[in-house]
Amino acid sequence: MRLILDTHVFLWWIVDSPQLSSRVRDVMRNPANELFLSVASAWEIAIKVNLGRLRLPDRPDRFIPGQLMKNVIEPLPVEMGHALYVSRLPAIHRDPFDRIIIAQSILEKMPVVTRDTDIAKYKIKTVW
């Protein structure tokens, strides 16, 4: 199964956070599953680091690609269609990064690994 990781799931995974559910750990460890991180998540992380709201052990432009490689996670580009599809989404979730991830989930037919209950309100499959 191809899965999109929500930003918090990626950050929790790389530090082995106890906040990850056992189901998520099992799904992410399963070699039959392909894990993806949206470029929107990388952008969100970079912005939060720049604003001082998130600390990383290295600059985002070095840290994130290194973690993707180490954890066998593929980047999921944001395409024009993803960005434009956001205009069709109901206004349940206001976070622009999450709205892109939701659009990617719909258009790419990929579940989202997330604890965010607002994302789960959309007509997409989520894993938690």
Question: In which residue ranges do the predicted regions lie?
Answer:
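Short, well-structured N-terminal submotif of metal-dependent ribonuclease cores
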Residues: M1-S38, L51-G66, E108, T117, ...
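Generic structural signal for small/hydrophobic residues in well-ordered secondary structure
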Residues: T7-H8, I45, V86, S105
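Signature tryptophan residues that serve as conserved aromatic anchors
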Residues: W12-W13, W43, W128
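Active-site neighborhoods of divalent-metal-dependent phosphate/nucleic-acid chemistry enzymes
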Residues: R53-P65, M69-R115
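Alpha-helix capping/helix-boundary segments
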Residues: V9, S41-A42, H82, I101, ...
